[in-house]
């Protein structure tokens, strides 16, 4: 008989799906004549649906539509909203450099078209997700205006009960591909001065089209791979090559004292070893005398809807 002991960590308080760079286009065209971006996203959503995962929120970190077309946003909404509703998950949309602020607002958010930065606060119980728009209309690099940084500092002045996740498109980290410097987030130090010493526990980003991790002013940064196509990191040094492979998304588990980011690759694979069902796993854990403590948010509790707060309206030239 084993002595009963608690696992080293309880169940997570929050579970998020982090999806990025869907790059949908209007009609039935292939992205850059090569990739069926709709199909890749559909495959991933079906894979996630079959998994039994039940996230609290799904965070899309930008480049939702390749050309900012209304038809692309309508298509994305048609694919994602039923999926999120079935999972009982809230949707969090982030602007990317390929997106159009006015069209995204109109066709994804049912808001009046506006070219002001799309910054907002999303509260899921005690977890705060801050969406920060790093896009520059007409360009592909990233910038954050002084007015945006002021708004961000004001929001972060009051800590959230369970901390803050910052979601943006351009990651404030180096890229291992030289060409990325032409489209990187500029003046990252200014953002760092605002974030340092706050309750931001993790930064979620996209843009790079490959999965990577780093830290920024001591805060973990997780970049999700794209769902449409990815960058080949084995390309000759200094070069760049997009490829139809290695797509995926990230799973984010938020615990009281840590945030865990895990890559979910698109597609399955042959089973290796013996498949263990959830029921079998529970029995084996119990037989080992181990129990996993529940999270502070009971999984059966019906959580209140996510509360959205937009930043104050600003002039497009602010």
UniProtKB/Swiss-Prot annotation:
The record describes the dependence of activity on pH as: Optimum pH is 8.5-9.5.
EC number annotated for this UniProt entry = 3.1.4.16, 3.1.4.17
Activity regulation comment? Ca(2+) acts as an activator of the enzymatic activity and is able to promote the hydrolysis of substrates even in the absence of transition-metal ions, thus providing an effective strategy for the regulation of the enzymatic activity. Two Ca(2+) ions bind at a site different from the dinuclear transition-metal-ion binding site. Activity is enhanced by magnesium or manganese. Activity decreases in the presence of orthovanadate and phosphotyrosine.
- Catalysed conversion reaction: a nucleoside 2',3'-cyclic phosphate + H2O = a nucleoside 3'-phosphate + H(+); 2',3'-cyclophospho-AMP + H2O = 3'-AMP + H(+); 2',3'-cyclophospho-AMP + H2O = adenosine 2'-phosphate + H(+); 2',3'-cyclophospho-GMP + H2O = 3'-GMP + H(+)
**Modifications after synthesis and translation:** Phosphorylated on Thr-309 by the eukaryotic-type serine/threonine-protein kinases PknA, PknB and PknL. Phosphorylation does not affect the enzymatic activity, but it renders negative charge to the protein, promoting its localization on cell wall.
Binding-site positions, Fe cation: 21, 23, 63, 209
Q: Its GO CC terms?
A: cell envelope; cytoplasm; extracellular region; peptidoglycan-based cell wall; plasma membrane
For biological process, the GO terms are: cell wall modification
Q: What is its main location?
A: cytoplasm
Give the superkingdom in one word: Bacteria
Keyword Nuclease (UniProt): no
**Sorted alphabetically, which InterPro entries does this protein's record hold?**
Calcineurin-like_PHP_ApaH, CNP_phosphodiesterase-III, GpdQ/CpdA-like, Metallo-depent_PP-like
What does the record's cofactor remark say about binding? Binds 1 Fe(3+) ion per subunit. Binds 1 Mn(2+) ion per subunit.
Q: Which UniProt keywords apply?
A: cAMP, Cell membrane, Cell wall, cGMP, Cytoplasm, Hydrolase, Iron, Manganese, Membrane, Metal-binding, Nucleotide-binding, Phosphoprotein, Secreted
Oligomeric state and interaction partners are given as: Homodimer.
Q: What does this protein do?
A: Cyclic nucleotide phosphodiesterase with a dual-specificity for the second messengers cAMP and cGMP. Can use 2',3'-cAMP, 2',3'-cGMP, 3',5'-cAMP, 3',5'-cGMP and 3',5'-cUMP. Hydrolysis of 2',3'-cAMP produces a mixture of 3'-AMP (major product) and 2'-AMP (minor product). In vitro, is 150-fold more active in hydrolyzing 2',3'-cAMP than 3',5'-cAMP. Can also hydrolyze the model substrates p-nitrophenyl phosphate (pNPP), bis-(p-nitrophenyl phosphate) (bis(pNPP)) and p-nitrophenyl phenylphosphonate (pNPPP).
Name of the protein:
cAMP/cGMP dual specificity phosphodiesterase Rv0805
The lineage, from the top, is: Bacteria, Bacillati, Actinomycetota, Actinomycetes, Mycobacteriales
